[in-house]
């Protein structure tokens, strides 16, 4: 790899152009920079300091960055679309009518507040009418069909070892606060106290007798579930998450919970093969179910129902949920406006119907063509990087090339749109009843895939989502329409900025196919070992250097980044930068672009990358994300990543002694 860069670096080191005559729209806003900071000292602050000053943290956010600015714009667009649709009186039964009905019900605060917790009553009555654990198993099955996540979760997706078929998977779930550490670590005592107070409040709003006792019972069950739950780091071990068995074996493996009755109640036929993601969790969960008094289990199930419903009921419920989950846990000081909450539901439940309208109005076909050109250039550059690796032998390289060549690329929007005709929305029912019906439809829709081949035309993300993904079991990379706009992509901006922004995003997702998890899958999306023992050890050794680099970062006083939890994302960041930079340099064909606003093309590449991660963030969110998120914080996705690239040092004349400099022997670039 180093030899490849050496062939490229001299080309731009000789560039000394200074005029601005290329006719391109500037992709860098000079007002976003903070020139009082040297790029040699803190490149993130230099590239984003002006933007950070102009975009203070909004009270409805714990973190506000360029992603959020674009997401806000999209929400405003969608809200205008929904409002316009309502004025046109859409046809009964149409997707437009379903979207409008859901939006209007969510906006009707008068009705929601008048109903209070009444929409929940029949569901809670069903819980408290349960007379024995056999009946509770049946109720859990019914609630899972309605989209609830009490005790554990189920879903249908590709078999990790045979991606040609889809199987049922069972995974840990059922924790209201989300992460096991909140229940078990001493440092989170205040969170536990706040959660108990919240549960007691919503139990009281729901008319439950002795709400404090019910809250304590529910919390006790959740704590025991937390004790047997896997950590976030354990859940990154893909191989450990694959434990196939038949449905008939479940009762023997996990006595205490009647899975035979559960499957019959859900009308799921006997399965010769399914996957249990966390064996030890299910052993603990089934033991807990058998050994816990029925009344405690009922309070737990009731708590899950109320908690999952609280954001969609009256203002009293929503306020209680906001005060705990947003204000206490994330430091957010202001609720999102109702229209944002309202449009989020149809945007989620009928995502592709919304996406179809969004694409027609806001996504030019020319953008798809330009992005595909960038993708193809990155694919070529990635192949060159594989060829240049001095730590990988030819047999492993051949498998890597085969996987790269077999990538499925999805850009903008699906070729086949999802059919929502079977989804029924009835405004005469409560908003909550409609959400349950919609969730039931989603679960049933997922279950129809059981035993069938994966539909490769399906998308795992809607076109209006500001994000991108790589799926290892389909070996596909996907870039929705919403992310293909400034600051990520601008068809009129110079290539340097586009390669630094959307190019790195594309390279990031490509590299996920070869990170510490993605590398375990072959070109067809099957989990299989295509690495020689020596190459496997070489990869792990390089990855360990990266772990230590990020472990050394102090995020807050006494709190360090978790280099192992974020390893996959950090590998992808590094790969994205490395591959996109090579693709950009290749695209120049030896030519030297003229400088724009005094910045060389190489400098603009790195500025384009850094600007993607500009953000304001409070300390509560920094701590939460550092401990729970597999992504590094924005500042570290810039400074920590770029310190590994000689091309970055050359672009900004960074040398030994400068704070941004990292000695060559401490750097690592895997791809």
Annotate each PLM feature.
Residues 1-5:
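Positively charged n-region of N-terminal signal peptides that target proteins for export
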Residues 13-16:
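C-terminal motif of bacterial Sec signal peptides marking the signal peptidase cleavage site
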Residues 18-20:
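Bacterial signal peptide processing site
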Residues 32-53, 182-204, 392, 567, ...:
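Hydrophobic/aromatic-rich, well-ordered segments within soluble, folded domains that form packed cores
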Residues 38-41, 46-111:
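Active-site-surrounding "flap" and adjacent substrate/cofactor-binding loops of secreted or lumenal enzymes
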Residues 60-82, 211-228, 498-504, 597, ...:
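Short secondary-structure subsegments characteristic of cysteine-rich extracellular domains
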Residues 85-373, 377:
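Noncatalytic, helix-rich "gating/capping" subdomain that lines the substrate-entry/channel surface
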Residues 224, 253-257, 275, 279, ...:
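Intrinsically disordered, low-complexity linker/terminal regions across diverse proteins
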